[in-house]
Each structure stands twice: as structure tokens, then as C-alpha cells.
Amino acid sequence: MTTLHFSGFPRVGAFRELKFAQEKYWRKEISEQELLAVAKDLREKNWKHQAAANADYVAVGDFTFYDHILDLQVATGAIPARFGFDSQNLSLEQFFQLARGNKDQFAIEMTKWFDTNYHYLVPEFHADTEFKANAKHYVQQLQEAQALGLKAKPTVVGPLTFLWVGKEKGAVEFDRLSLLPKLLPVYVEILTALVEAGAEWIQIDEPALTVDLPKEWVEAYKDVYATLSKVSAKILLGTYFGSVAEHAALLKALPVDGLHIDLVRAPEQPDAFADYDKVLSVGVIDGRNIWRANLNKVLETVEPLQAKLGERLWISSSCSLLHTPFDLSVEEKLKANKPDLYSWLAFTLQKTQELRVLKAALNEGRDSVAEELAASQAAADSRANSSEIHRADVAKRLADLPANADQRKSPFVNRIKAQQAWLNLPLLPTTNIGSFPQTTEIRQARAAFKKGELSAADYEAAMKKEIALVVEEQEKLDLDVLVHGEAERNDMVEYFGELLSGFAFTQYGWVQSYGSRCVKPPIIFGDVSRPEAMTVAWSTYAQSLTKRPMKGMLTGPVTILQWSFVRNDIPRATVCKQIALALNDEVLDLEKAGIKVIQIDEPAIREGLPLKRADWDAYLNWAGESFRLSSAGCEDSTQIHTHMCYSEFNDILPAIAAMDADVITIETSRSDMELLTAFGKFKYPNDIGPGVYDIHSPRVPTEAEVEHLLRKAIEVVPVERLWVNPDCGLKTRGWKETLEQLQVMMNVTRKLRAELAK
């Protein structure tokens, strides 16, 4: 009989119950006991949903109040010593301080979990880091599930992945792999505690096996699993997010009891494990996207495996279902307005039922679930033939693109002359990244408009009032190139998705980004085009209020792609180019309307990098082409800006230069301009605006701090190509600190301009 198991479930609840309880607790509106009760209820519901799918093992240990890697830092005693906390007796209050900071210590750094949109808290490892076991978190969840009469499988991220996703800190140089001999006995203690609590199987996840691991890290797997296998539980080694076929010989030799492989991201993997003689768990339902599976097709893959493996075949989702929204059945608006699209989707609860059907088909024959298989096939056929998805005009436009369709008319050296001729900017021109504070009044007006409580005319008047205020304040500050402040935008991707064809939105399709923060990604279900202008009216209104240049503001094609649930029936590169052409229509309309400085934001370019470096070039080529397509056809005198906010550029600088934006603004203040050194060494050819203060904090920088950063920038970038701007958009700031921060930036700029003029 084939076994069905789960690796992880969304933590936040169907209606973000955990988020609201956490935030109430932080505001001291509920007690710790009340928060714990909400969490316990959510865990029980999650397990019951898994049990309702006929799961042989429910997942435990995956639920967390903030992040599973933070839980692991606590469980191994690896919390940062700078907090002065005792990991053995950590209070919930202290746990949250690790994640959110306190008056004495900044929060643990966050970054994206592999190539997902989930953020984990990065372990801080020092040469002298000591580890200490505390298995309470995992044991408690195991016992709770057992008390409900369920068979449970604890899931723990493995020691090598734990070390891999951490960072080396401190003055002493060392390799974090050298901590393994100290860490391994602690893992043995944690696993032993789980065995004593009744765990039969334990899943140890090692997604690091899907990235380019150095040889010594790969070799370390032998010793690690030789040690861990001495614990008397059965070990299922979990891999996901990519192929581990290159490590097949190693994985077959490891003394574990089973292996989980991701057949959604890497469907070719069964060939590499055809002779595997232990449990082989195959992830056949997509844990990262929202499309219903064609179950007949899945069975065509899995039935031959069952014939070969018999009882050694296990099935599951490709990875934890953490990355998918909770329940499609509550999406009543989507069902009413787009019934076909609704029938093509599967959220977490629907995916559990897909796995139930697959298990029944494998164990009792396809006839036992003939009705469900027929419904799955009907949905797949409907999607394949839908005119809502496949549009001949969009396909023709892409097919007819000439070879150099993504190129500007002239090289940068010619364009910059044409731009300066009319812009006539001073040395060190100043600008903002885009957004200004989204006040309560703005949010209330938008909410009222969406509910039909505010007319379109009144909403437009309210937004125009905000735009006028933003323009007036920038003029008072004497900024050179202005922005309209984006008052009308709820979110930099959702705003455009609502105005482009091929996009749809959910009411409750929330997924956890980090901690209590959830995002509701748009769904790109069909060919993308732009029915009408999206930003022209707002930008031209803003331009009418000032003689200074006004920036048009667009979100770039790669970022829209990265922050959405993307259709899986055509290549992502094709979807991205469709978005780029839709944006190009907007760029040319802005230009026609007199907006001659246009920013196309691409904060997510780096996030899209494949896990394996061998795949980088292909991605960077189509990502760069998409960006260039979005601005192609502009006059030389139109200045194209882009903005990027992340800290690792060095390895992709040639690709960023190839995007050929006239001006790039980047987030650099928190790294003390270190990032800029890479641009200097690379001799980045176009204009550049490094952020001179950190907008993520309400703190107003001193003039000395901003001057220090700007002087560092002048050392690296030719002053005639240097812009001055904040790190990022100002959406999350209050007005008071925004104006004070910008005033400091302007004072320093004026001082250095005077100095440079001498």
C-alpha cells in the first residue's frame, strides 16, 4: 500500500487568525494564554485536515509563532548571544524580541528561503558558538497530535541546511561547516527526545542539496547521517525546490530509511533513483503554486513507480504547503465572477484532497475515484482550450517582435546628452524613489471606494489632494526630479495586476511572508495585455502642478512575475515578455503625454535567480530582455530609471548593466556604501543613485552620517553620474520624519555641490 504523508502546512489559518492574534498580543490586547490557545486550535485544525485526506502521517514541528528556522535556533541553543537570553528557558516575549528586535538589540536579519517568497531569520554563527539541545517545541507538537489519536511525523530542518542558511559573524574568520562536530550531538539529543516521545518516523529536511554545494559540504552528509541514523527512529531525508539527481550515488548510500524528492520542480528525477532500495517519497502535488493538478497525468508518472517500489512508495506535496493559500472554497467572488478559473485552482485544502484521490487510485484502483479523476481531467481540458487564457493577438505580437525589439534607439552616451539638454540638472541631482507616506486617510478613502461607500469622483479628488501635497512638499525641499507619491496604489504589483488582462485576485488567498506579515499574490492565469492607460492620468495631473520633471512610476515585468502566482502552462520567460510589452504600451503613452522621466522598478530581479548557477545566464538573459522591452522605442531624450533594493549585486553586475537603464537607484545606506564599491570596480557605465539614508527606520539621520555616505559614493562613482536619493520608497514612514529626513539629504547635497563648484 502506498503511504500518504505531509511535510508542512500553512500556519496562519484560513482567515489569518494567527496574524491577528499575534498582533493583538504585541499590542497587549490579549494575554499569552489567549495567543497560545489560538495557536493550539490552528494546529489541531491543520492535523484534522490532513487526517481527513487519509494521511498516514500528519506533519508536526512545522507550526511556529514566527519562523521554523528561528525555532531551530532555539532548539539548538544557537540564538544570538548579543540578546543575553537563555535558550533553555526562553519566554514567548523573548522569542518575539529575537525576531523583531528590542530597545537594546536589532532583530535577527531576514532573507528569502531558497527561491521562495517566504523569509526566514538568518542564524548568526560565531567561531565560538556553542549549541545546547531543547526539543520542547517538537515534542510538544508530537504529543498534541498523538493525543488526538493521530500518527505524526516530526519535521526538522537538517544540520547541514541549518548551517548553510546561516551567516558567519564576529571578528574571527572561520568556516561555519567547522561547527558541525559541536552541532551534531545536539541534533542526536533532539531526535532521541522525539523517539522517547513516540516518533516512529522523523523527516529531516535538507533542501541545501538542491543548490551548488561545495564539495566538502556534500562530503559531510556521509558523516552526519551515519551519526543521525544511530537514533532508533526511521529517518526520511527530505529534499525539495530542485533536483538532487547529481547526488544520487551519495543519497542511495546514506544510512537513512527513506528519501523525499520533488517531482514538480524536477520531474526527471525518478530515473536517477530507479534502483533505490528504501522508501522513496515523491512530491507530485505542487506545494508552491495554486493550480489544480491533472491527476490522470500524475498517475501516469506514479503508477510505474508503484509497480517497481510497492509499499516503499510514499506520496506527498513537492514541499511544505506553507507557500500556498489555505482554502479555495471561501473564494465566493472568484467562483461567481470567474467560474472557469475557480475550477482550475487548488489551494492547500484542495491539494490535500488531490493527494487523497491519488492514494485511493494507487491502492484501490482508478475506478474507486473515477468521478474525481473525471473532474480533474475536465478542468485540465477546459484550461487547455480556454479563449480567456490563450489570445491570438498577444501571441502574434510576441512572435512578430523583430530581433532588436528590446534596444533603445541610441547608446547611453548619446541618450544622456539628449536628456541633459532639456533636464538641465545640477551636479548631484536629487530625487525620491517613488512612494510617499500612505496615511490612514489614504487607506480609509481607498477602502471606502472599494466598498462603494465613496464615489469615483470623490475618490479621485481625495487622491489628487494627496498628490498635490506631495508635489508641494518636494518643491519646498527643492528636489530636482519629483514623484507623485503613489497615493492611489494599494501595492506595487496588485495595482498593475488589477489593470492588466490575464490577472485575477482572491479575497483570502494569503500566504505568510514572514512572522505576522502575509501577502496576497495576484494570479496570472492568461495572456497579458493592457486594455487602457494605467498611470497616465495620475502622472500628468502631478506634472501639471510643477515645472520640474515628474517621474512616471511603473513596476517592472520581472517583479510583477516574481510576486505573483504564475500560470504553469507556458514558460515563465514568455509570461514575463507579455507583461513587458503591456508595460511598454504604458511607457510610450506616458512619453506621449509629456512624462519624459519614467522609472521601472525591479526590486525582484535577483530573487528570480535559479538555485543552480548553471541556470543563471538563461534567466538573466530573458529577465534583462523583458526589462529592455518595457522601455524600448522611447526617444533618446526620455530618461529611464530603475530601482533595486537588495544587497548582493557583485555576481550579477554585467546583467544589471545590460538592462541599460539610464539611471539605477539602489539600497546602500545600511551597508555603508560597500555595495557601491562593486559598481565602481565594475565601472558601471550609466548614472547611479545610491541610497544615502535608511528608510526602514523612523530615525532621522544626522547630516554628518549622510555626508559620510555621499562622500564615500563620490570616491567610487564619477560625480557627474551620481544621483542623491533615499534607499527606498517612503510608503511606510510618517510625514514628520519623512520631511525631516529629506531636509537632511538636501542640506548635505547643497553643501557638497557648493564645495564641488569651487
UniProtKB/Swiss-Prot annotation:
Catalytic reaction(s) noted: 5-methyltetrahydropteroyltri-L-glutamate + L-homocysteine = tetrahydropteroyltri-L-glutamate + L-methionine
Keywords, alphabetical: Amino-acid biosynthesis, Metal-binding, Methionine biosynthesis, Methyltransferase, Repeat, Transferase, Zinc
Gene Ontology biological process terms in this record: methionine biosynthetic process; methylation
Cofactor note: Binds 1 zinc ion per subunit.
Residues binding 5-methyltetrahydropteroyltri-L-glutamate, per UniProt: 16-19, 112, 517-518, 563, 607
Presence of keyword Metal-binding: yes
Residues noted as binding L-methionine in the record, renumbered to the chain: 433-435, 486, 601
Annotated catalytic residues: 696 (proton donor)
InterPro entries reported in the protein's UniProt record: Cbl-indep_Met_Synth_N, Cobalamin-indep_Met_synthase, Met_Synth_C/arc, UROD/MetE-like_sf
Binding site for Zn(2+): 643, 645, 667, 728
EC number: 2.1.1.14
Protein purpose: Catalyzes the transfer of a methyl group from 5-methyltetrahydrofolate to homocysteine resulting in methionine formation.
Family note: Belongs to the vitamin-B12 independent methionine synthase family.
Annotated NCBIfam families: met_syn_B12ind, PRK05222.1
Protein name: 5-methyltetrahydropteroyltriglutamate--homocysteine methyltransferase
Organism in which the protein naturally occurs: Neisseria meningitidis serogroup C (strain 053442)
